[in-house]
Amino acid sequence: MKSLVSISLALIFSVTLFLKWIFQPSFILSEQELSKAKSREVTIYRDTWGVPHIFGKTDSDAAFGLAYAHSEDDFSTIQDVIIMVKQKSGLLKGKDGAITDFLMEWLRIYETVDKFYQSHLSPEVKQLMEGYCQGINLYAHEHNDEIKLNVFPVEPRDIVVGFVFRTPMFFGLDRELESLFNLKEKPKIQSSSKREKSPSPIGSNGFAVSPKRSENGETMLVINSHQPW
């Protein structure tokens, strides 16, 4: 009888911890990682319109500052992407999210990234991603009240996974898969006016300013941010 009670209490305790882990997410950087993040030599200056101007000693420092500024502006969307990359969308979005989790596994995204990560990415690119991840992780460490799920820390491999998974979607892979599994007839040419409307504001604008037209005589390139992605 005592053993049964002990097992029951242990089970209740385990379930309680599991539920707390899901519904009360938190993230604390180790002292070593916190020290590394805070040693970054970067300045984030926001102008009159709130646009961040980032100055870093190295490209990796600038990537760190960019990630922190991104997190300040839209940590919610960044988390949605991280949750997707970590194959936890089902916990946040239910059935629809679980489909995404399955699709990542079915396409062997992690397997592909693990196979080519070391050989296909230069040290410089890896340093950029490390800096960017540090920026996101520091923001998460400082803003636990904004965390949706326990998906931190973010690692450089996670960034690559996101690119490998999402890039084919730009070319219509998601629509082809939907048509395949739902046995729908493949639509003919689709006009922009008939495309499915997104519930979020959409913007996909990029433009450049030549030295002849800029005030300081320098070329300027505005990032195509693909909102809400």
What are these regions (language model features)?
Residues 17-228:
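Substrate-recognition/specificity elements adjacent to catalytic centers across diverse enzyme folds
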Residues 1-2:
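N-terminal hydrophobic targeting signals that begin at the initiator methionine
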Residues 5-20:
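Hydrophobic membrane-insertion alpha-helices, especially the h-region
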